[in-house]
Amino acid sequence: EIRSRGLGDVYKRQTEYFSHADDASFDDAKPGINKIWKVLHYNVKRNGGPDFWKFRTRVAKAAEKVGNLSLHVWAGSLGGPSGHVLVGYGSEDMSGIDNESETWPKVMEAYKELFGEDSFENDQEAFNNSLEMWGNFSEIWRWLPELSSPPVAVN
C-alpha cells in the first residue's frame, strides 16, 4: 500500500541544531545530579535579539550571585524556526519545579542589586516585548541516566 506523506510527517522528523549560550547560562551543580528540567521554548522576534539577550545574560549573572542553580540557554542555529531559544532550569526531582516561587524572587533581588532597583522590571518588560506573540511553550524533560551517556559539564 502506498500512502502519501504530508508536510506534518516531514516536520516531525526535522532536526534542529542548537548552540549553547554560555554567557546566558549558569550551573554550579555536579554533572548528572539534575534529572528534571523545566524547558521554556521562546520565539524571539527578528528585531528582539538585543533585549532578549540582555535580559537572559543578566539573569545568568543574578543566578550566579544566588548560587545553587542550574540554568542553561540554547539558541537555535540551524534547521528550526528563526529565533527559537530553549531555556532550561534543572533540579534533582520534581520538588525543584515546585519551589520556583522560592528561588525566582532571590534571582530577581540579585538582579536588582547588580543592575539597579528598576532594572528587573524594565528589562523583563523589554524581554517580553522581544518575543513573538505565538509559539512560546514549556515542557518538563526527564533525564534517564540508564539510557544516556555519562554526564559531563556543559560549560
Label each residue range with its predicted role.
Residues 1-11:
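Single conserved hydrophobic/aromatic residue that forms the stacking wall/gate
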Residues 86-87, 95-96, 101-155:
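A cross-kingdom marker for long, charged
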Residues 9-27:
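Short, structured interface segments
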Residues 20-22, 47, 92:
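Solvent-exposed coil/turn segments that connect beta secondary-structure elements
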Residues 44-53:
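Short, surface-exposed ligand-recognition loops at beta-strand->loop->(often short) alpha-helix junctions
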Residues 4, 32, 36-43, 75-108, ...:
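Short, well-ordered beta-strand segments in beta-rich or mixed alpha/beta enzyme
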Residues 17-21, 60-88, 98, 117-125:
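Short, glycine- and small/hydrophobic-rich beta-strand elements in well-ordered beta-sheets
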